[in-house]
């Protein structure tokens, strides 16, 4: 079996489980750092392991454009290419392609788009997205979907839902026919990647429910809720998640894509979400914004110039155990590359520790 979801304990709707994947086990609820271009920005892989990141994300769109999925396949797949022995989830590329707006053209077959790097023309279909992700060799592959923009009227959300469902079926058929082509070594004999379906439907609860129920009929090993954190208010995000979760199987992992702040991921985990990812901890770190037990800290603020306290007195991460706010502020103002490294290490540690505390809370 290439995916085994072992449910250990529940506390209300919250679930404590272990997700067994070809490249290791993942304790859920889990936060997944985003490694867009085969790199979690500013953090080397050995330090990701030291933070106890169990699974990271790779971005299909970016890796397809550079360095290319066939090159990565020929070098033994994404795990070997980036020297990451633990689990990897790749997105389908759909979100990035649909974010290109004027640079894309959508048809029933797929999406024609121009590269943001050099303007060259490319085409992504459900089948091509599967080919790219299988070549990358991720543990979890995402179905190619149409991400609905916000705001979108009901007719647009309905059209997007129907496209997503047709593309999910095409993704599944092509994936099932080619999943054994993953570039893994003989020690993974009999194991393959796993394909998750993605629920769309805009901000309409009934459309979300319908999409979830129709995806469940396709029998994916896991399900994601996509199209959130696209500009809608937090209350609406929460409402859509709460309305969608009951229509997804209790015995399979549930993944909410692209969320959120630390208090949000903790809230969603308590609602019954098993997996989450977000660029926020890494992106904010590069701009000097730190997440702490006392709230957000803009380390560039002048008031930290002589502050000898660690970034967070309640945090035991490798940064808080060694460096002061004054030093981190100095690195930012001097534009030292080390600033991004230390800030990112702390933020990721804070996010991962937030999920660890939620897991312990469910177990208690």
Can you describe what each PLM-predicted range is?
Residues 1-18, 26-30, 42, 145-151, ...:
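C-terminal extensions of enzymes
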Residues 69-75, 285-299, 352-355, 364:
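C-terminal helical cap(s) of enzyme catalytic domains, especially alpha/beta-barrels
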Residues 1-189, 302-305:
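Non-catalytic, usually N-terminal nucleic-acid engagement modules in DNA/RNA processing proteins
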Residues 24, 164-171, 215, 244, ...:
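Hydrophobic alpha-helical packing residues
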């Amino acid at each position: 079996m290439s995916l085994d979801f072992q449910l250990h304990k529940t506390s209300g709707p919250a679930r404590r489980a272990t997700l067994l994947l070809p490249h290791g086990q993942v304790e859920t609820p889990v936060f997944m750092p985003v490694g867009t271009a085969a790199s979690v920005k500013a953090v080397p892989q050995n330090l990701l392991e030291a933070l106890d990141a169990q699974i990271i994300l790779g971005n299909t769109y970016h890796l397809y454009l550079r360095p290319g999925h066939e090159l990565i396949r020929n070098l033994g797949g994404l795990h070997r290419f980036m020297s990451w022995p633990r689990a990897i989830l790749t997105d389908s590329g759909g979100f990035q392609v649909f974010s290109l707006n004027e640079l894309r053209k959508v048809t029933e077959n797929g999406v024609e788009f121009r590269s943001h790097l050099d303007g060259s023309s490319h085409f992504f279909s459900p089948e091509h997205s599967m080919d790219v992700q299988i070549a990358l060799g991720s543990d979890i592959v995402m179905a190619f979907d149409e991400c609905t923009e916000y705001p979108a009227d009901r007719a647009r959300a309905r059209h997007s839902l129907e496209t997503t469902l047709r593309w999910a079926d095409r993704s599944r058929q092509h994936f099932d026919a080619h999943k054994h082509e993953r570039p893994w070594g003989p020690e993974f004999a009999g194991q393959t990647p796993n394909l998750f379906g993605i629920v769309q439907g805009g901000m309409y609860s009934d459309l979300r429910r319908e999409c979830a129920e129709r995806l469940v009929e396709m029998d994916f090993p896991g399900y994601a809720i996509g199209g959130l954190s696209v500009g809608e208010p937090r209350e609406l995000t929460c409402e859509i998640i709460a309305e969608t979760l009951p229509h997804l199987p209790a015995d399979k992992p549930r993944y909410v894509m692209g969320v959120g702040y630390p208090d949000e991921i903790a809230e969603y985990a308590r609602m019954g979400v098993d997996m989450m990812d977000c660029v926020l901890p890494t992106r904010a770190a590069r701009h000097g914004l730190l997440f702490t037990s006392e709230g957000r800290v803009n380390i560039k603020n002048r008031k930290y110039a002589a502050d000898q306290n660690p970034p967070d007195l309640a945090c035991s991460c490798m940064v808080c155990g060694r460096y002061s706010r004054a030093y981190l502020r100095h690195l930012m103002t001097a534009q030292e590359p080390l600033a991004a490294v230390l800030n990112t290490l702390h933020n990721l540690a804070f996010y991962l520790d937030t999920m660890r505390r939620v897991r312990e809370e469910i177990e208690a």
